[in-house]
Amino acid sequence: MDPPFNEIYNNLLYNQITKKDNDVSEIPFSFSVTAVVEEVELPVIDVSRLIDGAEEEREKCKEAIARASREWGFFQVINHGISMDVLEKMRQEQIRVFREPFDKKSKSEKFSAGSYRWGTPSATSIRQLSWSEAFHVPMTDISDNKDFTTLSSTMEKFASESEALAYMLAEVLAEKSGQNSSFFKENCVRNTCYLRMNRYPPCPKPSEVYGLMPHTDSDFLTILYQDQVGGLQLIKDNRWIAVKPNPKALIINIGDLFQAWSNGMYKSVEHRVMTNPKVERFSTAYFMCPSYDAVIECSSDRPAYRNFSFREFRQQVQEDVKKFGFKVGLPRFLNHVY
């Protein structure tokens, strides 16, 4: 069932021990497996107020969303419009898919070629290894799937409802940052948005390996449905904190593109997933991305970042991961004119 994580771990360990020249790129300071961190509950926002509330309640809700995006880069939403029945079915279907043998998963015909991923192909050291597996599924794979299985119908329901929630939140954030809220309907299309189903198997070396390496998301915003195992951590006030699972909430986090588009008003925060020695963890995420040719440009007369297309951003991230083993991200696009 599991990918050959131990084999990869042992190969990386052997390479580190026998390597005579230290040419492994240094990873930023936050890339270290730490001991105990404080567990906190993210801000919780009842987004039903955006639809059903009076004008004053809607404005309070919008401000709460913007404030959490400025101060945390992460928040939770309840009464979000995605039923617990859909979420539970999504989890059950996900578990069933990951229970298949590794060889079958890696050659799966359920999704397009290359959808199944595991570990960190670019890893040159143990600290760059992610002890997890995933199915990376473009929205078009879901909507174009004519094989009406329980999996495809459940994914379509989850994806379409996540998409609606993402548009609603993005338009609120655009309004509160003085940007054009119609940008998302015009530019965030199904062929670049995607779902990612994640599984984090039990790891025998939890003090040495991440479930998912520290990173920021290369999108506008992410909607995450996770189980109650825990393991998600993020940076707040220059320290790592653990996110306390909330069974009634979805987690929302700001991506790199929103940080650049809002001129740094909203924060794309570094986060990671820790491993667990005994219990597996499951999550499903929806990533809101623009078309590849969409230009990320803020309306400020003193932009912190230069204009760039989503295609250019992706290519730069891929080049950095290949060269260094980790993503550099937005610092590559800082505007040095000011």
Curated annotation (Swiss-Prot):
For the protein in the UniProt heading, the enzyme class is oxidoreductase
Sample GO molecular function, one term: metal ion binding
Mention one GO biological process in which this protein takes part, according to its record: gibberellin biosynthetic process
Kindly name one Pfam family recorded for this protein: 2OG-FeII_Oxy
Q: Which InterPro entries match?
A: DIOX_N (IPR026992), IPNS-like_FE2OG_OXY (IPR044861), IPNS-like_sf (IPR027443), Iron_ascorbate_oxido_reductase (IPR050231), Oxoglu/Fe-dep_dioxygenase_dom (IPR005123)
Which cofactors, if any, are listed as required? Answer: Fe(2+)
| Residues bound to Fe cation | 215, 217, 271
| One of the record's GO cellular component terms | nucleus
Residue positions of the active site: 281
Q: Which UniProt keywords apply?
A: Dioxygenase, Iron, Metal-binding, Oxidoreductase
Query: What causes induction of this gene?
Result: Up-regulated by auxin. Down-regulated by paclobutrazol.
What is the E.C. number?
1.14.11.13
Tell me where in this chain the Fe2OG dioxygenase domain is found: 191-290
Q: How is the cofactor bound?
A: Binds 1 Fe(2+) ion per subunit.
Task: Quote the pathway field.
Answer: Plant hormone biosynthesis; gibberellin biosynthesis
Any idea which positions bind 2-oxoglutarate? Answer: 281
Write down the chemical reaction(s) this protein catalyses: gibberellin A1 + 2-oxoglutarate + O2 = gibberellin A8 + succinate + CO2
Q: Which PANTHER family match?
A: 2-OXOGLUTARATE (2OG) AND FE(II)-DEPENDENT OXYGENASE SUPERFAMILY PROTEIN-RELATED (PTHR47990)
- The family this protein is said to belong to: Belongs to the iron/ascorbate-dependent oxidoreductase family. GA2OX subfamily.
The free-text function statement in the UniProt record for this protein reads: Catalyzes the 2-beta-hydroxylation of gibberellins (GA) precursors, rendering them unable to be converted to active GAs. Hydroxylates the C20-GA GA12 and GA53, but is not active on C19-GAs, like GA1, GA4, GA9 and GA20.
This chain's protein is named Gibberellin 2-beta-dioxygenase 8
Q: Which organism is it from?
A: Arabidopsis thaliana
| Higher taxonomy | Eukaryota, Viridiplantae, Streptophyta, Embryophyta, Tracheophyta
